[in-house]
C-alpha cells in the first residue's frame, strides 16, 4: 500500500465508518482509488465546514477565503505537477488515471460555494441541484473509477449521491439550523407552516422531513438499477452503502421526532447485516425486468 493510499485510508477510517465498511468489499485497485477520491472529497468538506474528521460542522471565520484556497488548490492539483498536500495529490492521481473532466471536481467546489453564499433553496429542484454538487457528482466520479463510461449508468450513480444527500439533509436538519443553514425546500416549509428550531422537529417540520425522505426513495430505487452495470464486487460494495445509508432514513421514520435527541446513525452490527442484504440486491439487479425508469427525476448536467 502506497503512502498516499495509507494516508487516505486513515482519514476515511476516522471520518466515515459507513464508507470504510463498504469499501472493504471492493477489489484492491479500485478500492485504493475510491478511498483516495473520497479522502479528497471529505477533506474539502471539512475545510469549508471547519470540521475535524467526523465531527459536527461549525460556523467558520472567513469562509470565502477557505473556498478560494480550496478552489486554487484543486486547480493546482488538476492542472499542474507541483507539490500539493496529500488530499490533493490523491485527487490528482485518481483524476488522471481515470480521465476525469476537470468540470467534475470543480462541480463539487461549486457546491461549497453555494454554502458560502448561503443560497436559498425554495423548491425541491433547488435542493437537488445543491445535492448534485455536494454528493451526486461524487457518485459520478466513483462510478468512473469503477470503469463506468456510459452516461445513463453515470446518471444512476448520480442518483445514489442525490439520495444520500437528501438523507443527510433529513438527518442533520437540527444541526444545520444551529449554524444558520437550512436545506429543506422553502416552499414545503411554507405549505406545512413549519419552522426549523428547537432540539427536536415539530410535528409540522417532521412532515416536511418525511416528504424529503419520500423523495430520496425515488433516487434510491433508480440507483439500484445501476448496480447491474458495475463489476460484481463494486456492485456489492455500493449496494451495501445504499442499504447502510438508507437505514438512517428508516430510523427517522421509526423513531419519529424523538429520534433527533441523539445522533442518528447505523450501528456496527446493523451494518454487518446490511452487507449481506446488499449481496442479494446485486443479484436482483441482474434479473430480467429489474429496471426502473428515470422519467421525471432530476438529471445532472452532462459535461463534454
From Swiss-Prot:
Say yes or no: keyword rRNA-binding present: no
**Sorted alphabetically, which PROSITE patterns does this protein's record hold?**
SQUALEN_PHYTOEN_SYN_1 (PS01044), SQUALEN_PHYTOEN_SYN_2 (PS01045)
Primary enzyme class: transferase
Asked whether the UniProt record includes Transferase among its keywords, one would answer: yes
**Note on how the cofactor is bound:** ATP is required for the transferase activity but it does not seem to be hydrolyzed during the reaction.
One BP term from GO = carotenoid biosynthetic process
Q: What does this protein do?
A: Involved in the biosynthesis of carotenoids for the production of astaxanthin. Catalyzes the condensation of two molecules of geranylgeranyl diphosphate (GGPP) to give prephytoene diphosphate (PPPP) and the subsequent rearrangement of the cyclopropylcarbinyl intermediate to yield 15-cis phytoene.
What name has this protein been given in UniProt? 15-cis-phytoene synthase
Which species expresses this protein natively?
Paracoccus sp. (strain N81106 / MBIC 01143)
Q: Which gene encodes it?
A: crtB
